[in-house]
């Protein structure tokens, strides 16, 4: 693995408490319209004010209401590292993320399909000065991610939409924590989906089983005051 800057990874591991990646999204396939009117830059500023370590920006339009312009606007508005969240499966997608100014890209094992391709896309991202966050949904995905040399792994608690219509398993991240720990303390671990929603997984529970960070979208987007909502979440860790 090449020795390059890791602004995104470093931001997630800089403190002693669990970090938050706050997500900018206007809608989702599971929930429909969330806040279609929000501005990406203004939302990101609120997130950082509330204590977000990093920002995730959806750049996919039809299903999530995002765009590359959202990511560019966020990069201009905040100093926090920015993740491009999209269905990235080709080298061109990674080059596009770099051109947008992303500090990190999301690599979804299930969508990419092979260990070799995951490894190649991660290496490409690193060569362009970006981090790679590798997403897994199941134990099989985790095995592939480890074989590909993933150094940041996100457990998505939302199941395969082909089978379950985006059902969220709120215990999945906690259940998989032991498997992640077996990969070694150098792996940066992230929990995603269903975090701090009304019936969702709590930050304190994720911190208790060793996660480094949580990616939170819906619970913040739907809040009238994202900064205060995030501060309240983070205060539960103290």
Residue ranges of model-derived segments:
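Conserved, mostly hydrophobic/aromatic
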Residues: 22, 47, 55, 97, ...
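C-terminal helical cap(s) of enzyme catalytic domains, especially alpha/beta-barrels
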Residues: 172-179, 204-207, 220-238
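Glycine-rich phosphate-binding active-site loops on the catalytic face of alpha/beta enzymes
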Residues: 99-116, 154-165, 209-230
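N-terminal amphipathic alpha-helix/helix-capping segment at the start of soluble metabolic enzymes
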Residues: 1-34
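N-terminal active-site wall of soluble small-molecule enzyme domains
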Residues: 19, 32-133, 141, 173-177
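Active-site beta-loop-alpha junctions enriched in small/polar residues
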Residues: 23-27, 60, 87, 110, ...
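Catalytic cores of alpha/beta
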Residues: 89-101, 137-149, 188-216, 228-229
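Glycine-enriched alpha-helix->loop->beta-strand junction motifs that scaffold or abut catalytic
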Residues: 51-52, 77-80, 99-105, 126-130, ...
């Amino acid at each position: 693995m090449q020795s390059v800057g890791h602004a995104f990874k470093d931001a997630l591991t800089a403190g002693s408490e669990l970090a938050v990646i706050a997500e900018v999204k206007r809608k989702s396939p599971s929930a429909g319209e969330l806040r279609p009117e929000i501005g990406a830059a203004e939302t990101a500023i609120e997130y950082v004010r509330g204590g977000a370590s990093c920002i995730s920006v959806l750049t996919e339009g039809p299903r999530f209401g995002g765009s590359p312009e959202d990511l560019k606007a966020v990069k201009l508005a905040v100093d926090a590292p920015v993740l491009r969240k999209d269905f990235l499966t080709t080298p061109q997608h990674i080059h596009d993320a770099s051109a947008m100014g992303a500090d990190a890209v999301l690599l979804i094992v299930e969508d990419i399909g092979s260990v070799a391709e995951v490894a190649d896309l991660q290496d490409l991202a690193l060569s362009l000065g970006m981090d790679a966050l590798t997403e897994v949904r199941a134990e099989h995905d985790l095995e592939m991610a480890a074989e590909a040399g993933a150094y940041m792994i996100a457990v998505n608690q939302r199941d395969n939409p082909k089978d379950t219509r985006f059902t969220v398993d709120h215990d999945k991240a906690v259940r998989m924590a032991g498997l992640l720990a077996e990969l070694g303390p150098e792996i940066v671990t992230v929990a995603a989906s269903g975090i701090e929603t009304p019936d969702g997984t709590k930050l304190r529970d994720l911190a208790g089983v060793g996660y480094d960070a949580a990616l939170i979208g819906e619970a913040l987007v739907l809040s009238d005051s994202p900064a205060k909502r995030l501060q309240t979440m983070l205060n539960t860790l103290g």
